């Protein structure tokens, strides 16, 4: 029996948010926890920008924590409905603030790149047969363009050559 002084009454919501499941609307892609996603986005950030500022790593590790409250709505749905996307962005920002998470710059192109690249890499790792679908063909083209813009094209080549 666990002594009463060791009972956990409440787990921090930042930690709990790591249990949110991604890819639930794509049954052909295995489930991924938000903690796994955040950790991999941080790994990608450090691979491409090894001397980045702490705020970018902080953003990588917390950018989707608000999904604990609003859920993980797939990007294509948000792309199809800008009004929904704006409402979800606001609700996620409020949820992150209530969790005590500092304001995150979701418009930082490095975070956008790392987030998309993590999704692409996860699908490549777990469901590579899907990479020929138009959405993933567009994604890798977009990532190539972003890598050029961010001056990390050689790092992108290095990523795939290991």
Over which residues does each language-model region extend?
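Active-site flanking loop/helix segments enriched in acidic
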Residues: 11-37
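Metal-dependent nucleotide-binding catalytic modules
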Residues: 24-27, 32, 68-69, 91, ...
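Short, solvent-exposed segments of well-ordered alpha helices
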Residues: 5-8, 28-32, 104-108
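Post-HExxH zinc-binding segment in Zn-dependent metallohydrolases
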Residues: 84-103
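Divalent metal-dependent phosphate-bond-processing catalytic cores, especially two-metal-ion Mg2+/Mn2+ enzymes
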Residues: 62, 102-162
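His-Asp-centered metal-binding catalytic motifs of divalent-metal-dependent phosphohydrolases/nucleases
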Residues: 55-72, 115
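Alpha-helical phosphate/pyrophosphate-handling elements in metalloenzyme active cores
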Residues: 27-56
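Post-HEXXH active-site segment of zinc metalloproteases
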Residues: 73-89
